[in-house]
Amino acid sequence: MPEAIDASSIATNYYKLAHLCSVTYLIYTTNGATNDSTLLELELLIRHSHPKCLVTYYNKYLYYFQFNHVDEHVDLTKEYPQLQLKYSNQVSADLLANPPKVASDKDNHSTGNEYLAYACLSFLKAVKKLVLFNLSRNEAVQLFGNYAVVKEQGLSNFILHIDPILLPNGDLLISISEKCHLQLFDSSIVDISEIEAVDLNFVLYIIPSGIRCHLYDNVNVASNFTTDPPKNSEVLMQLIKYSTGFDLNQLNSLVWVKLVPNLQHLNNQTSKISKFIHPVDNKKFILWPWRLCLLQFGLSEKDTATSPHVLTCDPISLISDFIDFNISHHQQANITGQLNPNHQHNQSFNYSIPSALSTGMSSTGANENKGDLNMVGDIPGSVSDIFGIQSSDTNDFFNGPNFQPAQNPSDVKLDSQEPVKKNSDDEDVEMDDLFGDASEDEKAKTEVSTNELNEEKNFEDLFNDGLNQENQVDESDKVAKSIDEEVLKEESVKSEDLKEDKDLKMQPSSGTIPNTFIDIPKDQMTIPSLKNLKQTPQIYNDPGAPMPVIPTPIFPQFGINSTLPGSAQSVNPPTSAAATDNEANEGARSIFSPILFNPIIKSNIDTKYGKGGKFYVDKEVSAGPDIDSKRKTLRATSVSGFELPSRREDSIGIESITDDNDRRQVFEFPEEQGNERMKDEGHENHAAENDNIIKKMEELEEEDDNDDDDDDDDDDDENEDEDEESDEDDDLNLENNDMNMKRSPPLKLNTLNDPYVAQSNQAVVNFNDSNYNAKQILPNSYNASSMNTGGFSSPASLGFSSSRTNVPPKNDSPFGLNNLAREDRNGTTSPTGDNSDQPTKRQEQSDSPMVVDMEVEKKSTSKEAENTPSGMTTPNSRGSISESSNCLPLILRGVNVASIPTSFILNNVIVSNKISTISTNFDMDVDDETEWSDYELCKNNEMTVKLNNLDEFLKCLGPNLIFDMGLNKLQNSLEMKLSNNERDDEEYDNIEGKAPSRQFENKLCDIFPFCYKVNLNEFTTEAYVNELKGETTTIQDELDNQLSFLDDITNEDILNPKTQLKKLNSIEWDAIYSDSSSNEDNSKKYQGMVHNVGQSSLVNTLEDGTIFPLANDKARVLKHNDTIINLNSIGIKFWKYLNFSPLNGPKNFQLLLISEHDHNMLHHNYNIEFLNSLVYNYKECCFGNISKINLQSSDSRPDMEGIDNGLLMVHKKDEDQVYGNMYKQVNRKLNALVEMIKSDLINKTNKFEFDRPLLLLFINFDKSVNSLLQISKLIRNFKLFLSHHQLPLVEVFAHIIPWSLIIKQSGSQRRLKYLSNFRLSKLSMNLYNQCPNERTIGKPVKDPTKHLFTQLVKEPPSNLNFKFMNNGSNGNGKTTFNDDIFLHLAYERSIDKNWFSAAWSDPLGVVVSTKSWNCSPNLQKTNNKNVHSLESISDEIWTISTALFKKLNDEIIKRTSGLGGKKFLVLTRINSIIPDDELIHWKRLSMKHKDVSLIVLSVNKSPKLLFSGPIGPSQQEDKSNYDPNTNRTSTNMDNSSSTNAANPTCGVGATSNAPDFFKTFGSNNPSPNNNAGSMSISPSNNVGINFHSPQQFLNAPGNFLLPQDFVSSTGGSTNINANPHSNASQYNPDEIIHDPTEELTAVIPKAPLPSFNSPTRLGMKIGYLIKETGVSTHEDTKQYLVYEINLLSCSNYWNLNAIMKILLNQYKKLITLNDILCVGEIDGSITDDRAEKDSNIIPEMTPPLNYTASGLIPWHIAAVTKSLDYLIHIDVEE
């Protein structure tokens, strides 16, 4: 094995700031009554005035710390007379680092020891605040939450974790690491001037607190921004300056944004990640600088929609066929029109609505494209591609000289209608069904014919004479041409208006435009890509309903004067009561149902049905001033194509109630001081009128609530759930305003005094103006995306949705900062939630630190106070903003950044909140909709699942998420869409954090000049542990003191190294007070001594096992089906070549391959080819045999298709861009399969083998994120079908394979990839592991887990313990574990507390299991069995663990014929320490079950790229090993004897070569001679080749049977050093294959370092797994991956060093199980995407960083991480 690492050369992520011997701490309070906010403000002032002052507020006191070696200190009582010294004490660094739990009575200072525990925590907080403030002050970072953000490149920012640590020896360290995945962007990435056109697919966080906020108005987004600062802006900016060191006054034009803080996130709680962008009911808002906002963008699906079938179509032939049909059809139509002139009419109602196929999707209405053939460019991509039409070319073509525009819309009127006589021809009837009636006035019809003839002429010009055979012109063509000349002559005057008509095409056009359509006949549209669509609108044919007035249109008809759906004009009623009947009827028209449904019976029946249904609205319109006259009138039972509110009042805005002048009133944010506020003389009357209207609305709403109780049961339930998840405070319930006036919530924000201001005339900033001072009045702007950061509708446009919102908000806003902005303020609320009485006058606020040295604020505030009205909300104050605001909570309350999800996707947000428009998936089939709801399949890309059968669904989804061979990568299907296309290129999915950049290190060293990076050896020596404790003095130390006279004779540093350690610990220095004269000299002297001590202690670290390599694991396999052999785990990669057999016997099953059949693709036989290859490989690997399922449908069910040769093919239709319809087909066929299985059982045809499990093998062609969810639903439904048909004997398991693994697609061709033996064998291994164990038919499965094809080998005992010798343990606890049973349990709960996932495994792989639960707090109230509480989950976990312990105990009894040892459950919490609500259940269960002992660990989900070291000459030379053309050995044989003598004990698996883990090996090179590590049956000196060990067989040369290859016993290694390129080394029979990616080094620091997840709490012990990477940050350094394992709790049964060493060795085995269980990537080390595309590219031998990192994650940790990373994006619906 390689040599041991040099710990003194490896730099860690710790930086040493100081070495202290003693610290003095002082505790201050204020004079008189303690005011928390005063102390908080004083802390900010002191830190701003003295940046190097260690001060912090904690537990109602102000703590101030002083270093005793520093002479100059700040006297706080002199500078701040408000402070009063309460207590001071000087303590040693050891005592400050580890304070006693209970104060000693013998201590003279026992009265002050009660503060020592607080002083310990306060000291770390003070150091952290000092470091962060100085970094922020120097613009190195920006404060964010409880940490900071650092800018790497461009506009992206990453979280920077900075945690201080005080060691018992006096070392003051800071741990610095950068979080990789959470990416935040500066607010400047969004252009505010174009904010209305931007999809707001992001969430907002404010600096410095990190609190999530929502935009107040998400419809009129621009209205949220203003350049006018709030009245408390000076105080706010001053507070921000004091807290962050950043002065906002230096910015010229500061933009303010109106935000609603997320109160849930303020309490460190995370919103539901599956719908992370959600609306909030909270109306409390703040004005915050836009400069101090960070944005987190959501991930959306990549645009993967392709049309491969276009390549197989001939567009020329399609156009030719179209022209032929067009000519023949219109020849007949023109003759018919001339022979029957009386059937034509001049005026006709707009019956014909263009279909989705002819017009494309457009939400702007249907009439805008009438008479304009340019709408051909709007054809959907599937049609336009088929016809070869490009939009730009189309416009140029139809704008030619021969093209004529449609008739002027003003010439067409709709005053009268005439009956329509349809053509008797069948084709015309079909066209009428498709496009509506084709009857037109004579002029319009002639014009259409003219345009079409011109179109045909242009096509003839394009294709020359290709159509002459069928282009025969008859007399009708001559007549048409004469009419064409007349029309051209008449229309020549209007040529200038053509451009204006075209410009209006994309706008809502008038309803008077003549009715035309693209005359593509239905017969000609039945091409393969269109004939199966169901979007053709049909006339409503209900025999029991009245006759329809007009055919049901497919699109709403909007005129020029109407607006888009969702706007105020489309929702609000008419403003004039004198509207004509015509207008009333227009407003009452429905876009779907033209039927008038007015029930006569209105009594003796339930109100719900008496009104005509849930969507009934009164038709009567009164002319009086009553508010009902202003309501929108809808037809009874009408269904709108757009989302309508559930209540009538929801659609009424204030602009529909007040007059026009009131509606034009402008709402502005408060301007700067000195500006005049806009006033209206009739404002009081206007407000009073509004109050009267509000009262009427309340009365109407109460009546409506009484009437609609039954109608809105479902809506009420949804509202209750939303209220439970809402961020709205309990005190926002304004119905009980009087009762709540005296209550103070934890946080109250500003509330808009008039939240119902008309949104049509919002005052916004003209951001295009450079001075940012001008304002402009913008009309309604509803084109902002509803997918935004807050609610999905404007709070100002919600109308009067509830009676409680009509009451004016409360006045007691706690944000008044000591009454600086308001004089009549009473009371305040501290950030901690405690209420304290405050003086009511400014004269009594002299003790406020914000008043000290703030003359500017005094003057400005006094001027404002004169002109500022009372804070009491009155009708006269509508439109203003309450100016007093307590900004301390938003500045000082740092949110834990762990509550921010690393990513969130937008699938559920887009689908659930998108306006319900008609799409191409529109289907009139009611049964089809019922089918969707029954099967619970998603139509689009949403990630939703029903609550029913959720547990069964998770059982189907879990294995496909975890055991996926690393192929299902979520991030590959997602992308972050930014406005400037900025995104971090480095994406490391398997790396959680990394060391800070070199640029940041340079800034840190500039700010703290004497700090330095700590090397690893400083944590692994005894020099820094317990050196200052007096009780460590021994007899030897006393003897050394007596012999002190020898110092004059000899060098004591050489004779006694402890004297050097004492000198080292006596040196005090710090990097904080750099001005001190002694710091520079002491720091240099200290660092020099540290280097010397580290070099001398390197040998000690190797001897005591602090740093040791981990041995390669061995696996147990069967050879010749009867002999169990042990081999290195790398031999599993050559399973088929070595002819191994599974340890637990063969598993047989039957298979059904489910794949798609695309008739546009060539080479369809790849499915059967792959199936045959898999069946053959599975058999060749001795795993068993696979039978292909063959079932035929019975004669009584001809509708069911049989299954032949194990293939179930689903035909993909051309229009199936989304795979929803395909999943529906699979679901139907799986249901039919169950029926065929039951028929086979009844008929006893015995074609289905009930003694074999059934494998459903899916080839997944869907690239969307929800494809795994959809297929898991299919698997669940199949199991439900089996249960429904009472077929419990059928065992089912499923596996999903991405199509990219086995299929290569190029254009329209697909072929089977070359599948290596390695890949096929891996897939066979995976299927074997997932296949259920063999069982007797009819008996339940007894095994709680499935058998694996192999298991790892348990290490032999290092010594034999005999009971009579009693040497099994020492004084420090047990050190051996051979008889004990370890079961590892890893679990994690999502940060939104909705999902829970766990995985079990023993270190050898005997038992493995995984499971997930839904634990949503909101869904638990439904009492559904599929939702679990934390208590029930804990009980189930313990039950499963008990069953697994029993199986492990049975295995030990089977192997050793003896009883097992003690049971240890290694409880591992991922990404956090165990929270209190979880800890209480584990304590309860551990006390109940005494036979199981808990070992509690805390780990991270992935390693961090933290350590680095230099690249020496030897390492640089090792790079040649990566050259595939060389074949040299990786080590130097000359050093074998010397290094072995220097390192006699290297732990388990020690070899003759000293271990150096970080030397690189080529994967094709053999390892050095290793007699100790070879098999015991292999002789060390063997003449020739010996095949007793498979390891030797793997290294045998290909021509080993030739005579010249048999060499002497010394020929294997004699000439290696003489010629490094010699091939003589390959003849050594004892050489083994070695995989360098499996090499790990374990480090157990002796220093008590804290865990990353709990930086302020020391664990019992910490350990590291270290692995070298091929990535280097600089030319002279290389990087190391670090995986941290923190021991939180265990019994005193163990010695801490021994148990940590055991756990590190077991984690190495759990990492090896990654490959056996197919959890990690199967070929990440050898695959290069570029090499696959270009055969000339040689793949790099250095493995990718993601693959290297995955080799450092235990499989049970990776399983939990994979599960939760997907489950958190799934929304569970009731």
Swiss-Prot record:
Record key words, sorted: Activator, Coiled coil, Nucleus, Repressor, Transcription, Transcription regulation
Check the record and name the InterPro entries matching this protein: Med13_C, Mediator_complx_sub13, Mediator_Med13_N, MID_MedPIWI
Q: Where is the composition biased (Basic and acidic residues)?
A: 412-424, 491-505, 674-698, 855-866
Record field: compositional bias (Low complexity): 1525-1543
Could you state a single Gene Ontology molecular function term?
A: transcription coactivator activity
**Compositionally biased tracts (Acidic residues):** 425-440, 699-733
Q: Which stretches are tagged as biased composition: Polar residues?
A: 394-410, 565-579, 827-838, 867-883
Compartment(s) of residence: Nucleus
Chain intervals for the UniProt region annotation (Disordered): 394-451, 491-519, 565-584, 670-753, 797-883, 1507-1548
Give one Pfam hit by family name: Med13_N
GO CC, alphabetical: mediator complex
Q: Which family does it belong to?
A: Belongs to the Mediator complex subunit 13 family.
General function of this protein: Component of the SRB8-11 complex. The SRB8-11 complex is a regulatory module of the Mediator complex which is itself involved in regulation of basal and activated RNA polymerase II-dependent transcription. The SRB8-11 complex may be involved in the transcriptional repression of a subset of genes regulated by Mediator. It may inhibit the association of the Mediator complex with RNA polymerase II to form the holoenzyme complex.
Record PANTHER family: MEDIATOR OF RNA POLYMERASE II TRANSCRIPTION SUBUNIT 13
Q: How does it assemble?
A: Component of the SRB8-11 complex, which itself associates with the Mediator complex.
Please state what the protein is called: Mediator of RNA polymerase II transcription subunit 13
For this protein's source organism, the top of the classification is: Eukaryota, Fungi, Dikarya, Ascomycota, Saccharomycotina
